[in-house]
Amino acid sequence: MSLAAPFPYFGGKRRAAPIIWRALGDPGGYVEPFAGSAAVLLNRPAHKGRRVETINDADGWLVNAWRAIKLNPAEVAKHAAGPVTEIDYHARLAWLQDRRGPELVSWLEGDPEAHDAKAAGWW
């Protein structure tokens, strides 16, 4: 089953996903070191049996977005809904940039359920 990525991502591998899965076959485990929009994983063919899937990314806000989508999708959708004025957009971007860094990653690493749905929607 193929799922659409919930957001566009520069450098995404959506178009390459079928080629990648033909090359990989049907592994029981899959680790994505640079998840981005997770287009490859979301386009994984149906798999029978046990499987382990892991996505990673160095961008703390991206990790927060995936965690918030998993744990609190309705709240993320609420904050992602528009319309947004240009001033709001720039204010949100500045807010996110001011909070990006080692502290964000430490917060996410310190609690497997830590997430900020508002930031995920804004991101």
Summary of predicted features, one role per range:
Residues 42, 47-123:
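Class I S-adenosyl-L-methionine-dependent methyltransferase module
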Residues 1-35, 39-48:
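S-adenosyl-L-methionine
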